[in-house]
Amino acid sequence: MKNSIKSILIICVLFAGFNVTAQKLGHVNSQAIMQEMPDYDAARKELESYKNDLTKELEMYQKLIVEFAQDYEQNKGGMSAETRQRKETDLMERQQNYEKKAYEAENSLQQKEQQLLQQIMLKVNNAVKDLAEKEGYSYIYEVTTLLYAGGEDISDKVRKKLGIAVTAN
């Protein structure tokens, strides 16, 4: 019994020496902040222009394929079997090239979007990190991934740090 009491007292003394501090938690909606940045509008416009250029290029290529197919259909009656076979093969190759170009255009568009938005997201992340270090936050969570957002919403502080006007809620 005496050993149990001594053990409990020793444990109490040990834990009394620890300085228990509350962790400062915050959350931020970086997507909303990002969309409010002037850089975001410029990136969206650049991306839209890039998409339009790719679309025009694909439409022109598709138009050439349609014209080739129509020409083939109109003139296939007067063609030899060998010429018809060559034209059909050519048409299939053109269609496959079009599909390949469309796939490459989609990938290129996604890469461009990622490249443009990554630079903006980096600015937001750096502002969040700066704020966390200066104001002593232990953790800052992205609000879009949480079911419950406890702690302080630092989104307006990040907006101010990035020079974005903050409206009163």
Regions found by a protein language model. Name each.
Residues 1-8:
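Bacterial N-terminal signal peptides that target proteins for export
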Residues 8-17:
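Bacterial N-terminal signal peptides
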Residues 18-22:
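Sec/Tat signal peptide C-region and signal peptidase I cleavage site
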Residues 23-169:
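Amphipathic, charged alpha-helical segments and their helix-to-coil junctions
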